[in-house]
Structure formats: C-alpha cells, structure tokens
Amino acid sequence: MLPREIEELLNIILQHNTWRRKETINLIASENVMSPLAELVYVNDFAGRYAEGTVGNRYYQGTKYVDILEDSLSKRFAKVLDAKFVDVRPISGTIANLATYHALVPEGGIVASLPVKYGGHISHNTVGGLKALRVKTVELPWDFENFNIDIDAARKIIEEKRPNLIILGASLYLFPHPVREIANAAKAVGAYVLHDSAHVFGLIIGGVFPNPLKEGAHVITSSTHKTFPGPQGGLIASVTDEELNNAIQRAVFPVFTSNYHLHRYAATYVTLIEMEHFGAEYGARIVENAKALAEALAEEGVTPVGERLGYTKTHQVAVDVSKFGGGDKVARLLEEANIIVNKNALPWDKSVLKPSGIRMGVQEMTRFGMGKGEMKEIAKFIARVLKGEDPTAVKREVVEFRKTFIEIKYGFKIDKEIIDKIFYSLNLYT
C-alpha cells in the first residue's frame, strides 16, 4: 500500500499526461514531444550520476560510459551542423547562452541584441541573463514592414557602438534573420556573431532553415526540445578557433554548471539519429503546416502578422488579437477549450506585460501526424472561441478531434523486448 500522498502525486501525473498528451491541441512554440524510444532511454541510471569536467578529464570515477555518450553525441552534432566544436553539457539554452557570453565578452563589453519587444529572448537582454554579466547592451533596430532586423540601421549601430558580440535568433521568430549581412558588418569591427537557434534548431537539421554557421555566425546556441524534439537541454556549436572553444568549455564548467543532467544524453542521441532519418520530411511539414494555419486563421477573420511576407518561414505563427481583448485574455479563453498557446508581445506593443498578440507553434501537432487539413480545423476552433462561443462546448470537440492523433510520427518504433531490457536493467520489474 502506497502512502496517500504518493497516490495523489501519481494521480496528478496521470491526469496531466492524459490532458496534455491526448486531449489538448498544444501550440506552445517552445515545446514538443519525444518519440517513444527517446522517452524510454530517458529513464536510465545516468540520472543519479556525476561527471564534472570534460571527456577523459573528469573529477569523478565511474564515468566511462558517460564519456562514450558525450563524445559520440558531440561529434555527431558537429558533423551534422558542419561545426568544429560542439559542447552538449549545458543543461538549457539559457545556460548555453550565458556560457558563450562569458567566453566572448569581457566585463564592461558591449552586446548588441534584439529587445524582448522585437522578439528577443530574455537571456539576450539585461532583464535576463545579461544582467549578471556586467556588460553594456545596445538594441538592434527593427524593420516593422519586413518583420525583421533593419539591416541598414543595424550596420550603422554596429559601426558606431562597436559591440563585442551581436546576438541573432529570437523567441518570436517568423523569418530568418540576416545573418550574412550582420556577420559582414561584425567582421569590420571585430565582433563575434552568436545565433540563438533554440526555436529553429530542428528546422536547421532538417534543412528547411539556413544554418547560421554557414552564413557567418561564429557560434550557435540551442535548446534541444523545440523543433528538435528531444529532452530539455542545451548545446553550443562553433566554427571558431581552439582557444575560443576552450574558453567556452571553461565557461560551461566550472562557471555555469557542475553536473550536466546526464540522463538526457541518450534521449538526445536517439532524437538526433531520428532527425537524420526523418528531419527533412518533418521540418518541411512543420513549415507547411505553420503557413497553412496562418492562412486558415486569416480566412476566419483572425489576424496573423506578416501577411505580405507569407506569414512565416518557421514553425511559428503570431496573431494580433487586440480586437478580441489582447493576448492574456485570449490565451486563457483558448485554454478553457483545451487549445494551449501563450500570450506574446508584438513589436508595436507599448508594454510586453500587456501584449496584443499570441504566439503559436505547430511542431508538436505536426509530430502527432497533423497536416494542412487539420490546421484548417484548428483555425476554426480558435476562431469560434475568439468570436464568443462557449469554450467548454469547443473543448468537447477538441478532445474528440485529438483522438485521431495520438501516435507520435517521425521516429523509430519500439517493442516490448526493448522496454523489458531497459526496465530489467534498472530493476524496475520484480
């Protein structure tokens, strides 16, 4: 007999699993689901182990299999990304960012980045991680018409302010940033270019989004759980010299991490191999679905941004819902209908705390097998709620709609023999 508190905990887990995995239309742009095989190998003995240091140079014994995994995973990512160096030890995208900033920017140095209101991540700004590093920041300018960095104005700022580091990539990221143009401007003043690829990492590996390392970026950072559908974690990849790569390694440990959540390595490795096999098809379908969702929303009288530009070239769709009460109100209403989105500031908003927009991503629903036809159905569900229909009535239809899309696609199948091997190795079967 288990304690009552454990039974209650298990009930919470089971309720959450059923709700989020089987009954909702999840459109959070920063989330995804792992394949059954990746989830299976995520349960392993590495979860309780330590491996401070680097491959072959650890501060603990008992790490020979950690070394094999970490070394193989880093080298495989490097090959796929055409990078000279990859560090998979950061436990998140933000930690990857902070370690790279620490290695590239001296105390008192200057960082140029997009503010949050233009889509920049909090870790790109002094409201987030940069605040702890004692650096100065300058804002990259925004081209409202093209929903992107203003290239000409950015060149002038780079020439005038001479930053040590320029951060590209974004949290609201509809169209590729002008990496090549910014890299050319950076070269003239000796600045490094970092591209935060967290949102588009899977699209890069799938070949449907430009690889920033091939366009002039010195470093990319990423998380491993958005369009790249692995476990939560981070990585750094660079094409810079050995001295800088060593500086990045020293920043990852001992400055910003001690242990590295080793249990995620195997699941990340499985996901990388799956993306090598299925990533091109998966990535193409993601971008296709995002555009289809935006077009369908527009037909329903809901206003996605970027119409003149084709709405999106990533997994994301951004919608101006100011006429429906703003982002916070709309996100809450949609959750009542089991449609999960997040409120999001749009570039013209006066306050990021009272956003006029919502942000959506189609990567998870795509992995459950949805296509352009389903995007039209989702747009209709959203429009019905926004136009005043009772969310609980829509919710019943959403739950029924999801019953057809339970199996995770673009990954390897598993059988009971594999499950038994893993569980027996951990003494989970008695």
Curated annotation (Swiss-Prot):
Binding site for (6S)-5,6,7,8-tetrahydrofolate: 120-122
Cofactor: pyridoxal 5'-phosphate
Transferase keyword on record: yes
EC number: 2.1.2.-
InterPro entries per UniProt: PyrdxlP-dep_Trfase, PyrdxlP-dep_Trfase_major, PyrdxlP-dep_Trfase_small, Ser_HO-MeTrfase, Ser_HO-MeTrfase-like, Ser_HO-MeTrfase_PLP_BS, SHMT-like_dom
Subcellular location, record wording: Cytoplasm
Recorded coiled-coil stretches: none
Primary localization: cytoplasm
Protein origin, superkingdom: Archaea
Positions of the record's site feature: Plays an important role in substrate specificity: 225
Gene Ontology biological-process entries: glycine biosynthetic process from serine; tetrahydrofolate interconversion; tetrahydrofolate metabolic process
GO molecular function, one term: pyridoxal phosphate binding
GO CC annotations, alphabetized: cytoplasm
Modified residues (N6-(pyridoxal phosphate)lysine): 226
HAMAP family: SHMT
Quaternary structure and interacting proteins, as annotated: Homodimer.
PANTHER family: SERINE HYDROXYMETHYLTRANSFERASE, SERINE HYDROXYMETHYLTRANSFERASE 1
Database matches in NCBIfam families: PRK00011.1
Family note: Belongs to the SHMT family.
Function: Catalyzes the reversible interconversion of serine and glycine with a modified folate serving as the one-carbon carrier. Also exhibits a pteridine-independent aldolase activity toward beta-hydroxyamino acids, producing glycine and aldehydes, via a retro-aldol mechanism.
Protein's name according to its UniProt entry: Serine hydroxymethyltransferase
Organism: Pyrobaculum aerophilum (strain ATCC 51768 / DSM 7523 / JCM 9630 / CIP 104966 / NBRC 100827 / IM2)
Name of the coding gene: glyA
